[in-house]
Amino acid sequence: MQEQYNPQDIEHKVQQHWDNNKTFVVSEDPNKEKFYCLSMFPYPSGRLHMGHVRNYTIGDVVSRFQRLQGKNVLQPIGWDAFGLPAENAAVKNNTAPAPWTYENIEYMKNQLKLLGFGYDWNREFATCRPEYYRWEQEFFTKLFAKGLVYKKTSSVNWCPNDQTVLANEQVEDGCCWRCDTPVEQKEIPQWFIKITAYAQELLDDLDNLDGWPEMVKTMQRNWIGRSEGVELKFAVKGENTDLEVYTTRPDTLMGVTYVGIAAGHPLATKAAANNPALAAFIDECKNTKVAEAEIATMEKKGMATGLTAIHPLNGREVPIYIANFVLMDYGTGAVMAVPAHDQRDFEFATKYGLDIIPVIKPADGSELDVSEAAYTEKGVLFASGEFDGLDFQAAFNAIAAKLEAEGKGKKTVNFRLRDWGVSRQRYWGAPIPMVTTEDGQVHPVPADQLPVILPEDVVMDGVTSPIKADKEWAKTTFNGEPALRETDTFDTFMESSWYYARYCSPQADDILDPEKANYWLPVDQYIGGIEHACMHLLYSRFFYKLLRDAGYVKSDEPFKKLLCQGMVLADAFYYTNDKGGKEWVSPTEVKVERDGKGRIVSAVDATGRQVEHSGMIKMSKSKNNGIDPQEMVDKYGADTVRLFMMFASPADMTLEWQESGVEGANRFLRRVWKLVREHTELGQAPALDASALNADQKALRRDVHKTIAKVTDDVARRQTFNTAIAAIMELMNKLTKAPMTEAQDRAILDEALKAITLMLYPITPHICFEMWVALGQSNIDTASWPTYDEAALVEDEKLIVLQVNGKLRGKLTVAADATQQQVEALGMQDENVQKFIDGLTVRKVIYVPGKLLNIVAN
C-alpha cells in the first residue's frame, strides 16, 4: 500500500480493471437470484450535475450491495436523448440536434465512468437512434390495430407570427418566448393513446406497490381521480338538444340555479352565431390557456347565452352561461351550478346576481348560513320535495334512481385522467408512423417499412420543424397510392415509458425478447426524482400493462420498489444590477464570513463586490449555484464525492452541499487507509480465537458485529445509508483507540477492517478494492457481504444502575445471567447504597431485568 491515500491513481487503476474484466456485464442465469437496479436515465444535456451524481450513486450502492449478497445484478444505463433542449441548443450553436446530442453523450459517458458506477455498458442505447424507436413505432401501429390509438382535435399553443406550435414552457406570460406575440389556442388533430381504458387497473394496482413511497401513490391516485357520480341531462328550451352534465353531488340537484358551459361547447358556438359580444368572450376564453390547478384562484368570468335549460326533476327554467372555469377537456364541458353548496358557483352567482337556493342543512341541527360563502359539507336535504330529510348517500341513491326511471340520468364512474396525447409538433422526436392517403384515410405504416427514420442532417431555423418545412419528406406511398407522412413526432415520454424493458434485450429483433424480459423484470429497485410521480411513472406503468397484454411480459407492474432521492441544495448569491435585476454569482467565486452558529453574515465575490446570500436552494443553472461534479472528483476523488453524497442526508431528503462536509468525508477515508496500512505493515494477523478473549476484547468484537448487524439492516431494509455510514465511523473511532499489544487485539482488528472494507465497498468501491488486496484477500468484486456472529453479540456482563428512591446512587457490573436475588444482594452490599438507606426501612425493591435496581426506603 502507498503511504498516502492517492485517489486519482487508485481510481484510474481500478476502473481499468473493471473495464478489462467486464466486471459488470451480466447475462441471464436461472440458477442465480436476479436483482435489477435502475436509476432514471439521464437527458444528455452536456454535463452531469450533482442531482445526477446523487441519483446514480444511490443506484450504484444498492447494486453493489446486492452483488455482495450473491445475486445476479443488472444495472444498465442509457440516454433519454430526444427533446426540446437539443433543438434550442442547436439553434443557439448553429448546429443540428443530433451532433450536439451525440457529443454530449460521449462527454457524459466519460464522466459516469470516472465516478466508478458499475454499469453494464454492453446494454447502453440512446433513444434517438432508429434501432430503438423503430420498436416503439411498430408497437404504436399494433395499438392502433387494437383500437387503443385514435386521432382527435385538441388545443395547442399557437404563435400566429411564427405560424408554429409552442410547448407550454415556450409560453412566457401568455406570449411567444421568441417574438413576444400573444399566444392563441388553436385546435389541431392529434394522436392519443387510450390510457383511460386502463384507469381502474392503474388505480387498483397501486395497492400492490408496497415498496413505493405513500406520497407518490397518493399523487397518482389523485391524478387518476376516480369519482362516483351521476350523469344527467338538462333539456334546452326551444332546442332539439340536451345538455349532459356529470356531478358527484346529485343530493344538491334541487339547488341548481344555472348551468355553466365551456367556451368550446357546441351550444356556445351556436349561441354566439348572431351575438358578436358572446363571440368575442368565447375567443377570449379560448385564448386563455388554463391549467386545472389555476381554476381555483383565477377570476371567474361568464356571459349569458340567452339560452335556458330545464331542470330534469322540477321543470324549473335556469339560464345557461358560458363560464371560463368550465373546461371542454374535462367531463362533458358542462356543469350544473349550485351556488349555495359549491364555492366556485357561489362566487360566480354573487358576481352575476344569480339565485342562491340552499337545499342542504347541517346534520347536527346547527344553523345554515350561505350569506358569505357556500355550505359545502354533506348534510340533510330540505326544500327538495320528496327527498327532504335524506342524508347524502340516501339522497344520492334516490335521486339517481328517479333520474334513471325517467330516462334522464344514470349512476356512473368518472376519472379525472385524460387520454395520453402523444403528438408533438416538434422535430427532435420519433416520427409517428402513420400516413394519410388522398381519400383522407389514415393508415399505419406497415412493419416492413419501419422505422420511419428522422433525418438527422438538418438546418434548424428555430421556428418550423425541418420535417414540416421540407414538403418532400412527407411524400410517400401506401399500397401504391400517393400518401403523406405524419409530420408530428412522439411525446418524449413515449421513449422513457419502456426503456427499462429494452435494457433486458437491447439487441432483440422485436420490442422485447420475452424470455430475457421475464428473467429480469420487474425492476427490483427504481431510483429517481419525485417530480416524475404523475407523468413518467404513470405512463411507464401503463406501457408495461400494454406490453403484458401484448404477451411480452408476465408481471403487472414494472417497478417493485421506488426510492425518490431528495434534491441537492447549495448556497446561492446575487447582486442587483443597474436595471434592478438579480445577477447570480457562483458560490465557488464567493468568500463568506460566518457567525458562531455557522450562519453567513457577509459575502464578497471575486471582484470584491458585496453580494446577497439568497439561502440554500436547489442547484440550478438559472441561480448559477451548481457545483461541477468534475471539479470535485478532480480535487478529492470519486470515492469522497460518493461518500459525501450518501452520508450528508437521508437518501429521500434534500441534501445541502457543503464543501466542508466533502473535506470531512475525505479525512475519514484517509483515516481508514492509514489504519489499514499500519495494520498490514505488521504482517499477517494471527487467527482469531473467540474463546481466548478478555472482557475488553469481547466488548470490542461485540461492537464490530453489532455494527455489521446495524449496517446490514440500514442498507437492505431501511435504506438509511447515512446512518449506516455513521455506524461505521463510530466503529472506526473505537478501533483507533483500542490497544494493539496482544495477538488477539490484532486478530480482532483484522476481522474489523475486513468487515469495514466490505461494508464501505458499495459506497467507496475504489479505495476498498485496494484495501481488500492489502488485507490479503483476492477480488472484492466477487466477495460476500459480512455476516455477524450471533455468539459475539451475547454479552457476558450487564451494567445495572442502582437507585435509592429513584435517585442514582451507583452502578453495578453483574454476570449477564445473574438472577434477581443475586442482583438485589449485590446491590444492597454497595457502599453508597448502604449510606443512603442507613436508618431507613426498605419498603420494596423494583428490578428492571438487566438494567435497573431501585430501592424504595423511608
From Swiss-Prot:
One of its GO terms (molecular function) is leucine-tRNA ligase activity. Keywords: Aminoacyl-tRNA synthetase, ATP-binding, Cytoplasm, Ligase, Nucleotide-binding, Protein biosynthesis. GO terms for cellular component: cytosol. It is found in: Cytoplasm. GO terms for biological process: leucyl-tRNA aminoacylation. ATP binds at K621. It is an enzyme of class 6 (ligase). It catalyses: tRNA(Leu) + L-leucine + ATP = L-leucyl-tRNA(Leu) + AMP + diphosphate. A motif ('KMSKS' region) lies at residues 618-622. A motif ('HIGH' region) lies at residues 42-52. Its main location: cytoplasm. SUPFAM superfamilies: Anticodon-binding domain of a subclass of class I aminoacyl-tRNA synthetases, Nucleotidylyl transferase, ValRS/IleRS/LeuRS editing domain. InterPro entries: aa-tRNA-synth_I_CS, aa-tRNA-synth_Ia, Leu-tRNA-ligase, Leu_tRNA-synth_edit, M/V/L/I-tRNA-synth_anticd-bd, Methionyl/Leucyl_tRNA_Synth, Rossmann-like_a/b/a_fold, tRNAsynth_Ia_anticodon-bd. Its EC number is 6.1.1.4. It comes from the Bacteria. It holds the Pfam family tRNA-synt_1. NCBIfam families: leuS_bact. Belongs to the class-I aminoacyl-tRNA synthetase family. This is Leucine--tRNA ligase. The gene is leuS.
